[in-house]
Amino acid sequence: MPPKHNPLGLNPLQLRTLTLLQQLARLPDYSQPGEEAGSIALTRLPHPHGDHFHIGEAVVSSRDATGLRNPAVWAALERKGLVRSTPPSAVVTPRGLDYDTGLRETILHWADHG
């Protein structure tokens, strides 16, 4: 039997937010190794300009990132063991890094932006 998609039952906003946190964790401009083995500490979050923002080479619609500033989303992700919130930053746990949201190709756009 194939693995269940979204086994933790994350809602769409939580899935989008985790997808963005996973991408931020891949980039040294936004992250560094965490204290826990396999975790990544996020050192900052991107700021939107207009209707989008950049995560490295990817362009993301601001509407897909509303969860980055939503305390309820962070609380849910933390409760499910995917992140640890340590304001003003956060740690994405190994479980959070490995969780397949299925949205990476949907919300991260790799177009040229000038």
Task: Tell me what each language-model feature is.
Residues 1-65:
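Short, amphipathic alpha-helical interface elements at domain boundaries
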Residues 3, 79, 97-114:
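Short, amphipathic alpha-helical interaction segments positioned at domain boundaries
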Residues 28, 81-84, 103:
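Amphipathic alpha-helical interaction segments
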Residues 55-57, 75, 106:
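Generic signal for short, ordered secondary-structure residues
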Residues 61-80, 84:
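Short amphipathic alpha-helical interaction segments
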Residues 89-94:
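Minor-groove-contacting beta-hairpin "wing" of winged helix-turn-helix DNA-binding domains
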